[in-house]
From Swiss-Prot:
S-adenosyl-L-methionine binds at G176, E177, S208, S230, L231, H232, N307. This is Dual-specificity RNA methyltransferase RlmN. The gene is rlmN. It comes from Burkholderia ambifaria (strain MC40-6). Reaction proceeds by a ping-pong mechanism involving intermediate methylation of a conserved cysteine residue. CDD domains: Radical_SAM.
């Protein structure tokens, strides 16, 4: 039985686990063994960790725990998209979405309960900010999804060889702004990349930011993964209105940060995400302006048809207008994709990762009715 003050081992990346084992008088190799049991074999209790010394198992039982967030609901869409509602306590909930494709499986992970950035087109921002998630709550989403998906396919836990892995890509694009929860997000991403945990490459872990420039620089220095930037407007006046963070870090500053990031990034381009809003940011003139503002940043564009919600006062661009907008970008030689809507029958489509919009991320309302979820993205 663990004590009420026991540490949750899911909060530790490799370095943290080595330090913790050291505090118990154990050598670093014990931390690697422990990490494999937790993240590759999905072990939930210490007695089953048979290659650990009994003395260490007894120490762990008295001082540590492996505590996962609770699953409040689990839904599968007609197109195979799977959405979990995760109870993170005190009435708050976040959502995790798995998007299966022929050659990969992408997991969209949340980093905060609610969001303080308050983008006009994003329903998550309308519910307000509740709190940051812990490292355990972030990596717990991947651990939960990977082993639930393996179980559904009849695959046993074990080392994450390519043939066994179900989640091949992770996108930090669920609820919240990950760079405003840097100290919990980075250890979680280190575990995603660790060969003694999930073994994903840096090219297969993508962090999406609305443009927190100082933290983009820090991420580039400490853990450069693939980067997506929520752009959504081609000039400062419009972006100030759609993405209020732009008032603090305007486009010129953001583009310079993107250039710096590319010097260390695992991919040779930035993905710019652009939510298509009818009559707001979707004209061909906007597209030409977008090309001008991003001209010095190697990039691709991901155009996202807006998923309306009542509080926004916005509507989705017409399909023919999205095509015209995209064609301007394509004709300029820039790779451009239009997001395919996935999981909309379970409210897991792009723009719907939100929670009960009028009452933050309150759990009770969301377990009894369809949840409104932010951007579910497969890059």
């Amino acid at each position: 039985m663990t004590s009420e003050t026991s540490v949750n081992l899911l909060d530790f990346d490799a370095e943290g686990l080595v330090a913790y084992c050291g505090s118990l008088g154990e050598k670093p190799f014990r931390a690697k063994q422990l990490q494999r049991w937790i993240h590759q074999y999905n072990a939930g209790d210490f007695d089953g960790m048979t290659d650990l010394a009994k003395s260490l198992r007894e120490k762990l039982k008295g001082r540590a725990s492996i505590v996962m967030p609770e699953i409040a609901s689990d839904h599968v869409s007609a197109d195979g998209t799977r959405k979990w509602l995760i109870d993170v306590g005190n009435g708050n909930a976040v959502e995790t979405v798995f998007i299966p494709e022929e050659t990969r499986g992408t997991l969209c992970v949340s980093s905060q309960a609610g969001c303080a950035v308050n983008c006009r087109f994003c329903s998550t921002g309308k519910q307000g900010f509740s709190r940051n998630l812990s490292t355990a709550e972030i990596i717990g989403q991947l651990r939960m999804a990977e082993f639930a998906l393996r179980a559904s396919l009849g695959r046993a836990p074990g080392p994450n060889g390519k043939a066994e892995r179900v989640v091949t890509n992770v996108v930090m694009m669920g609820m919240g702004e990950p760079l405003l929860n840097y100290n919990a997000v980075v250890p979680a991403m280190r575990l995603m990349l660790d060969d003694n945990a999930y073994g994903l490459s840096r090219r297969r872990v993508t962090l999406s930011t609305s443009g927190v420039v100082p933290m983009m620089d820090r991420l580039g220095a400490e853990l450069p993964v693939a980067l997506a930037v929520s752009l959504h407007a081609p000039n400062d006046a419009l972006r100030d209105e759609l993405v209020p963070l732009n008032k603090k870090h305007p486009l010129r500053e953001l583009m310079a940060a993107c250039q710096r990031y590319l010097k260390v990034a695992p991919r040779d381009f930035i993905t710019f995400e652009y939510c298509m809003l009818d009559g707001v940011n979707d004209t061909e003139a906007h597209a030409r302006e977008l090309l001008a503002v991003t001209r010095d940043v190697p990039c691709k564009f991901n155009l996202i048809p807006f998923n309306p919600f009542p509080e926004s006062g916005l509507i989705r661009s017409k399909p023919e207008q999205i095509k015209r907008f995209a064609q301007v970008l394509i004709d300029a030689g820039v790779v451009t994709t239009v997001r395919k809507t996935r999981g909309d029958d379970i409210d897991a489509a792009c723009g719907q990762l939100a929670g009960a919009v009028k009452d933050r991320t309150r759990l009770a309302e969301r377990t009894g009715a369809a949840a409104k979820i932010i951007e579910v993205r497969a890059i």
